[in-house]
Design a protein with these regions (language model features):
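Bacterial N-terminal signal peptides
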Residues: 29-38
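Extracellular jelly-roll beta-sandwich "head" domains, especially the C-terminal globular C1q domain
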Residues: 20, 41-183
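N-terminal secretory signal peptides that target proteins for export/translocation
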Residues: 1-23
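Small/flexible residues
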Residues: 4-5, 10, 26-27, 56, ...
Length: 183
């Protein structure tokens, strides 16, 4: 009888061990699966809608103009949306320099279908600024990222409006790229 009780106790311990380990394994597998799903569900995946690059430099003294977005002198970039109220992210970057008195600057404004994207700061978004001496460029690799909700499905276009401000006399924009993404 003593031996049977010992075997029963051993069998109960083995069953308990297997049950606990199975529960732990199932719990771990469930935690891993939920974590993976949470990571993929909460990731902010954007899809590339359009892009353009321009190699080389543009320089001038003009203001309030649309900058070339590629080497073919296109000042707009087309993209399309397939859902209403699409959240669009535009990233524009270029090497930038400006001449003028202290505190003068070059600004870029991102337009989608002629509407200013956010932050809608007009000519007050300083893309690059002048040096205090007014005769040397302060070269800057600058980036402007903007967001806008596009209400309609279909074809759209993005443009970059450039202004020189506060007495700036000359601007320079080097190699550039623009990327349009949709969330």
């Amino acid at each position: 009888m003593k031996r049977n009780n010992g075997l029963r106790m051993l069998a109960a311990q083995i069953a308990s061990f297997l049950k606990n380990n199975t529960t732990k394994r199932l719990t771990l597998a469930l935690v891993v699966a939920v974590t993976f799903l949470a990571m993929t569900a909460s990731a902010s995946a954007e899809s590339l809608k359009a892009f353009a690059t321009r190699a080389g430099n543009e320089t001038g003294t003009n203001t309030h103009f649309l900058v070339d977005l590629d080497n073919s002198s296109h000042t707009s970039l087309a993209f399309s949306t397939s859902t209403t109220n699409s959240l669009i992210k535009i990233t524009y970057n270029a090497e930038c320099g400006v001449l003028g008195p202290p505190e003068s600057w070059l600004s870029v404004t991102i337009l989608v279908d002629g509407v200013q994207a956010n932050p809608a700061s007009g000519a007050f978004f300083g893309f690059c600024t002048s040096l205090p001496n007014g005769v040397d460029y302060q070269w800057t690799g600058a980036t402007r990222q903007s967001l806008i909700r596009v209400p309609n499905i279909g074809a759209h276009f993005v443009q970059v409006l450039v202004d020189i401000n506060y007495g700036a006399t000359n601007w320079w924009l080097g190699d550039s790229s623009i990327v349009v993404e949709q969330q």
